[in-house]
């Protein structure tokens, strides 16, 4: 994790930090013990069935934790550099973009209200009251616009949070399409 934060800093992105791997982040969120993650979760959920719905409910302590955070501006700056080939080698930029274009989660988020044929290269994040999506939306003519949309500490249904992201993304896309 420290190496990722250092790399982001080298890209000029300071409002981003990576402190834990995904395994540790999930263990901290669900307050799980050691051992294989799936087994630890299943054991904890048997003892406390409310854990099964925790993944879509806000957790004030978790939301206030400064670890593993990035401001939307920091994320957008990093993604702009990455998609433009300024942060990775040309080959790695192609691989990165292809991976982001294959994202199958969050179809109701950044891509949710895009016109048919619009390429959206994105990555979602969901935990507790946080629902987000970051990536690049293609524009006709070969350009694109990077969007980092976060909904944090929300008790609204996930579908409502996703719709907010989709509406923002479509508005941003249309603005850049028609303003240029």
Residue ranges and their predicted role:
Residues 1-56, 70-74:
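Active-site-adjacent helix/loop patches that line small-molecule binding or acyl-intermediate pockets
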């Amino acid at each position: 994790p420290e190496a990722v934060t250092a790399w982001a800093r080298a890209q000029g992105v300071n409002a981003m930090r990576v402190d834990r791997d995904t395994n540790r982040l999930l263990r901290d969120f669900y307050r799980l013990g050691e051992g294989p993650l799936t087994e630890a979760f299943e054991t904890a959920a048997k003892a406390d069935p409310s854990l099964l719905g925790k993944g879509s409910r806000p957790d004030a302590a978790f939301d206030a934790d400064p670890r593993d955070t990035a401001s939307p501006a920091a994320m957008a700056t990093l993604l702009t550099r990455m998609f433009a080939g300024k942060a990775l080698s040309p080959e790695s930029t192609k691989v990165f973009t292809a991976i982001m274009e294959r994202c199958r989660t969050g179809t109701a988020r950044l891509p949710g209200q895009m016109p048919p044929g619009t390429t959206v290269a994105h990555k979602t994040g969901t935990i507790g009251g946080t629902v987000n999506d970051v990536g690049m939306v293609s524009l006709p003519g070969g350009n694109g616009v990077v969007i980092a949309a976060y909904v944090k500490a929300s008790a609204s249904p996930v579908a409502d949070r996703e719709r907010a992201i989709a509406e923002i993304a479509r508005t941003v896309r249309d603005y850049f399409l028609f303003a240029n």
